């Protein structure tokens, strides 16, 4: 994980993807569930990445200025959902959105860009963790035959 984050400071993109069947521990492993009250050993990957990002910002702040923006995208049944957009918390809001459309596009140079996604400027790990908690509370969850 640290090498991926360090690569971002050098201008590279990085992605960590959790994929698996229902109940396999993706949310727990990534740490996008509520982390309040969990021990240091039990927090997931995302809170650890947040902590490391801000450690690196602190170590490098004499050489560069940093602006960190946070967004939270959910892809559910091939539909894109902005989890930081206010008023996006109910299933009805998602079925009949009154907001701008989110799209993912490949640019001419091959980079992938997301348009229409809310970005929140954060100045600390605590602010970024608050975005994570806020967005996590808006994720779509539903039972499947695996839960039965």
What would you call each of these model-derived segments?
Residues 1-21, 31-148:
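P-loop NTPase "switch/coupling" elements that transmit nucleotide state to mechanical/effector output
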